[in-house]
Amino acid sequence: MQTVYRVYEGAREPHRLAVARTAEVLGRGGLALIPTETVYGVAVAVNAFSDAVPQDTSEFPSWPRDPQAAVNGAAVPALGTGYRRIFTLKQRELTQTVAWLVDGVEALDRYGVDIPEEARVLARRCWPGALTIVIKAAPCVPTFMRAADDTVALRASASPVVQALIRACGSPLACTSANTHGAPSPASFAAVEGRILEGVDVAVDAGETPCRDASTIVSFQHGGLQILRQGALPASEI
């Protein structure tokens, strides 16, 4: 790990240098440790590994593929890339895909298809916030970033740091909790495992997270709302 930037998570405008430098690393395909309002996560910029969001390919070269690995029949980024290090650090399978942090409700139709109106209503009510919504993936979502049932999980985070990074990168962030698979998710910078901190390219320290719990996950894939994981957002508020 190269650099740690310390910011005040409660500030409306996170430290500009921290955002700019972290976004620069993400744009190059690097891996960042970032605070959200729920727990700390490890994240990459989606546009560094896909065509879902256009990028200047003269500045950011195409990412290397791994000919020995595939998800849903599609090539995945090579070992050592930011995306693959998510799975190496967490010690989890490539098929356990990563949710996207997005800029708002419009992202449902940008990165999904056949969106139920109930999902839009729920997103308008609960976003930005601690709710992840699983939807059918649009063609622009890379095959290797989709779950086996052709879905992608989206969340608009209330964290000013996350919001600023999404704007600076011009891209969603593929982000998952910064922990060994099966271990508790870190709700503070101090709780992040040392080996994970050492395995990222840049880190943002905002102290403790406001929610101190992972997001609640819901799906509309089987004819109605299903709660897949109970998290920081109570079922009574869904």
Features from the language model and the residues they span:
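Active-site-adjacent structural elements in enzyme catalytic cores
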Residues: 1-238
